[in-house]
C-alpha cells in the first residue's frame, strides 16, 4: 500500500483532529510508535511486578492501562491490591499513555523545544493537576490523611481523563463536587495521538479558543483574528472541522440519551452510562458506578450503548458513514467499474 493511501487511513483512524508522519515513510512511523508502545508497556509490567503483582496480573493491568481499556483481573479493580505503590505506578502509567506519542519521539530525538511548546500537553497536565488538588481537598474528610486523599484523587483523575476506567475506591460515594469534576473529565479525554478516548484535549482547547475568537469578531467585525496553536494560526478548515465534529458528537449524544431514557432509570445513571460508553470510560455513577454494572439495561439499550462505544472509539464519522446511502452507492459504482 502506498504512503498516500496509508496516510488517508491514519487520518481516518487517528484519535484526534490531526495526524502526521514522524519520519518520511509511514511504515517507519508506525514501527516507531509501536516500538514505544511496547517498551512502555514492558516497563509498566516490570514496575507492577516490583509492587508484588504476579506476572499475569501485572500483564493484564499494564495492557489495560496501555490501551486505556481498563480491564482488570480483579472484581475490585486496582483497589483489590490496597497498595499505594501499585496505585501510583498505575496512575502514572495511565497518565503517560494519555499523552500524544509523538512527544515521546521528540524526547528521544532531543527535540525538547517541540515538547515544551505543546499547548495540548500543558493543558492536559494542568487539567490533571487542578482536578487532583481540588478533588483531594473535597474528599479529605473521608480519608483524613492528605497523602491518601491525593493518592485516590490522582488515580481517579488519571483513570477518567485517559478513559481507562480503573478504580481504587467507589468514587460514587464521593461528594458532589468530586463527582462533577470526574464527569466533566469523561468528556475531555486524553491527548490526540494517544490511546485515550473522549473528545481529546486538543479539540477542547480549539473549541474554547474558537469561541473566544468568534466573540472578538462580534465586538470587532473588521478585525483579523485566528485560532492559534503553538504559535501558529490554525487553518480555518481545521477549526471548522473540530466544530463540526463536536456538533455531530453532541447530536449523537442527545439522540442516544433520549432513547436511553425510555428505560425508566434515574437521570444520573442514564446520563453517566451514556457518557461512560460514548467516551469509552467504563464505569459511570449511580447504578453503573464502580461497584455497579449495565445488566439492568434492556437488550436494545445495550445494543445502542455498544454502538456508541464503537462510534466514540472510531471518532464517530466512520460509523455514521455506514448509514449514508451515497457511501454504498459509491462502493457499488467502483465495483461495477472494476468488473467492466
What are these regions (language model features)?
Residues 1-340:
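Membrane-proximal intracellular helices of multi-pass ion channels
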Amino acid at each position: 500500500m502506498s504512503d498516500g493511501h496509508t496516510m488517508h487511513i491514519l487520518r481516518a483512524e487517528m484519535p484526534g483532529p490531526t495526524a502526521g508522519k514522524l519520519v518520511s515513510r509511514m511504515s517507519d512511523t508506525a514501527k516507531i510508535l509501536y516500538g514505544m508502545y511496547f517498551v512502555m508497556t514492558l516497563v509498566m509490567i516490570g514496575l507492577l511486578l516490583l509492587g508484588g503483582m504476579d506476572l499475569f496480573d501485572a500483564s493484564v493491568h499494564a495492557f489495560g492501562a496501555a490501551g486505556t481499556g481498563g480491564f482488570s483481573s480483579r472484581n475490585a479493580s486496582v483497589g483489590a491490591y490496597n497498595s499505594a505503590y501499585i496505585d501510583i505506578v498505575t496512575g502514572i502509567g495511565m497518565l503517560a499513555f494519555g499523552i500524544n506519542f509523538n512527544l515521546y519521539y521528540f524526547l528521544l530525538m532531543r527535540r525538547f523545544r517541540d515538547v515544551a511548546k505543546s499547548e495540548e500537553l500543558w493543558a492536559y497536565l494542568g487539567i490533571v493537576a487542578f482536578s487532583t488538588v481540588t478533588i483531594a481537598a473535597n474528599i479529605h474528610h473521608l480519608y483524613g490523611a492528605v497523602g491518601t486523599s491525593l493518592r485516590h484523587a490522582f488515580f481517579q483523575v488519571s483513570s477518567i481523563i485517559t478513559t481507562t476506567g480503573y478504580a481504587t475506591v467507589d468514587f460514587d460515594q464521593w461528594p458532589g463536587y468530586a463527582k462533577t469534576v470526574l464527569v466533566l473529565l469523561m468528556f475531555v479525554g486524553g491527548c490526540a495521538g494517544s490511546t485515550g478516548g473522549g473528545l481529546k484535549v486538543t479539540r477542547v482547547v480549539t473549541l474554547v479558543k474558537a469561541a473566544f475568537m468568534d466573540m472578538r469578531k462580534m465586538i470587532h467585525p473588521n478585525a483579523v483574528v485566528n485560532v492559534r496553536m503553538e504559535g501558529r494560526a490554525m487553518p480555518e478548515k481545521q477549526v471548522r472541522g473540530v466544530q463540526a465534529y463536536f456538533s455531530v458528537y453532541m447530536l449523537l449524544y442527545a439522540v442516544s440519551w433520549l432513547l436511553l431514557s425510555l428505560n425508566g432509570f434515574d437521570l444520573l445513571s442514564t446520563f453517566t452510562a451514556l457518557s461512560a460508553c460514548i467516551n469509552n470510560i467504563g464505569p459511570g455513577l449511580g447504578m453503573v458506578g464502580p461497584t455497579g454494572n449495565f445488566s439492568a439495561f434492556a437488550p436494545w439499550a445495550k445494543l445502542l450503548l455498544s454502538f456508541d462505544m464503537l462510534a466514540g472509539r472510531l471518532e464517530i464519522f466512520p460509523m455514521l458513514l455506514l448509514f449514508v446511502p451515497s457511501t454504498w452507492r459509491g462502493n457499488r459504482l467502483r465495483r461495477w467499474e472494476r468488473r467492466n
